[in-house]
Amino acid sequence: MGSYLGIYTILVLCLLGYSANAEVFTAGGPPNSDITAAVLKAFTSACQAPAPSQVLIPKGDFKLGETVMTGPCKSPIEFTLQGNVKTDGGSTQGKDRWVVFEKINGFKLNGGGTFDGEGNAAWKANNCHKTFECKKLPISVRFDFVDNAEIKDVTSLDAKNFHFNVISGKNMTFDNIKIIAPAESPNTDGIHLGRCEGVKILNTKIATGDDCISVGDGMKNLLIEKVVCGPGHGISVGSLGRYGWEQDVTDITVKNCTLEGTSNGLRIKTWPSAACTTTAAGIHFEDIILNKVSNPILIDQEYCPWNQCNKNKPSTIKLVDITFRNIRGTSENKDAVKLLCSKGHPCENVEIGDINIEYTGPDGPPTFECTNVTPKLVGAQNPKACVGPVVKAPGKE
């Protein structure tokens, strides 16, 4: 039986933060039915409403094909996902997206429901973690040019590619998000962000097969707080420098987070032989708990996946004003701290304050390595901090 669309008006002051009288556009159907058309119709009606409105997917299990919801809308809009939506297995094949919200100012996504990407079959055929020349898979949920938004109390399960991708947004908050995929699921970044300003990621649990959070170029004023990450590849700034059109990264704060069993911890990564010259400045990691984390603190300015770069040409990305404060816990390998900076642009003003990282493996005590950086030391450091030599690039005075 086909899906249906119900439209009715109710008082939703407690549910909506926008208005005491809001029109609610419901998109539902029989169990396991395809509600794609109903969702698009509901969103179109809500987007044209003269007052704040709500799109509601009720409790239940539904199928959802490629769904692109585009503004601008006449008034703020709330998208409430109470049910569980799964990919339909057809309309997203060969596409790079599943659910898209774009060009919306004044937006809420909530409801306690789940976006189920059903990625298990796709992961087996995915080789994007081995080569850049691979077939792209759909990102589960994209936010493109979305401003003044709150995304809260939703789950992303088993994404085929990234769980959430956030591009060119302003004043967005992610709160109490759950992201779930197996550790072996390739390219399933939890939240990837680029060219946004004023984003907060709070009280969120991420277990996935790639970076829990990855910060791309052009990010400004990002706060990541009270996030639990693991399994996964840690919290990363970068990679930066692969493309010539990239922009500076400024004011990134990661605080009061816990990393558990991740293959990397707190990481900044830039490409050698970079295609641009940009700056990443004001990056602060503080009050972090580590539990069996490999490579807990890592600056890698020789990041070169798929061997698609020339490591003989140093990275042209400048890293300035970087701090690691009150980082404590256990490492799964002896490389507790590794600061591998560019010989073309040595890291500037890197501060290491009060770190205590323990390792008890058979290959010796934990190490603290520095290349092309002389960090400022504050408080105590375990392992004992290096005072790294600065190696000048050829032709530099």
Curated annotation (Swiss-Prot):
Glycan-modified residues: N171, N256
InterPro entries per the UniProt record, alphabetical: Glyco_hydro_28, PbH1, Pectin_lyas_fold, Pectin_lyase_fold/virulence
Cell location: Secreted; Secreted, Cell wall
Signal peptide: 1-22
SUPFAM superfamilies: Pectin lyase-like (SSF51126)
Entry GO terms, CC: extracellular region
Keywords: Cell wall, Cell wall biogenesis/degradation, Disulfide bond, Glycoprotein, Glycosidase, Hydrolase, Repeat, Secreted, Signal
GO function terms (MF aspect): polygalacturonase activity
EC identifiers of the protein: 3.2.1.15
Gene3D superfamilies associated with the record: Single-stranded right-handed beta-helix, Pectin lyase-like
PbH1 repeat feature ranges: 169-195, 196-217, 219-239, 249-270
Catalyzed reactions per annotation: (1,4-alpha-D-galacturonosyl)n+m + H2O = (1,4-alpha-D-galacturonosyl)n + (1,4-alpha-D-galacturonosyl)m
Domain of life: Eukaryota
Gene Ontology BP term (one): cell wall organization
Residue numbers annotated as active site: D210, H233
Expression tissues: Pollen.
PANTHER family per UniProt: PTHR31375
Stated role: May function in depolymerizing pectin during pollen development, germination, and tube growth.
Family affiliation: Belongs to the glycosyl hydrolase 28 family.
The protein, known as: Polygalacturonase
